[in-house]
Amino acid sequence: LFGCFHSPWDDRVEQVVKACRLSTKSIYGELWANGMDIKDLPKMLDAGITNTVKLLLTNDRKKMKKKYLMQNYRFFLAVMKSSFDSNDHQTAMMLYMALTHMSVEGLDFKRPKKAQGKLDTVGKTYGSVESCYNKHVTEMLRENVNDYLPSLIACSMYVNKHDAYAKAFKNMGH
């Protein structure tokens, strides 16, 4: 019955979710291979968020119209929700931070009706920068490690000693 409502857009979302999940696993693999040396991790995570914001706000170097901005927003929102539902929390948190970035929040365009609800669900599940995403870290400790990919963004806040990461994200508009 639900097959008649399936579209190429759904296939694209699924493809991107799978690719992002592989990327998350690659980041974990690289950390493991480097003996958990995380000195470059904050730069990599910041670059991921910044590049996602750039992708959201661009249309193949052409002038961005609201129509394309809305399409990009809707697409990344769907990828975030699907990643969240499939326990790829690195991707979900990165997209959440991109979608709620001040560069995106400040733009005047119509968001999808259910966008705020999806963002609120993710935000409430993870906690805030001010709480160092303690809800996510607490949840991570209780989950099955085989299927659950925790967010390195949240985890790295507990590794950095002087809350430099929290300060940087606040300065970036979060």
Show the residue positions of the predicted features.
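Eukaryotic small-GTPase/lipid signaling interfaces
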Residues: 1-174
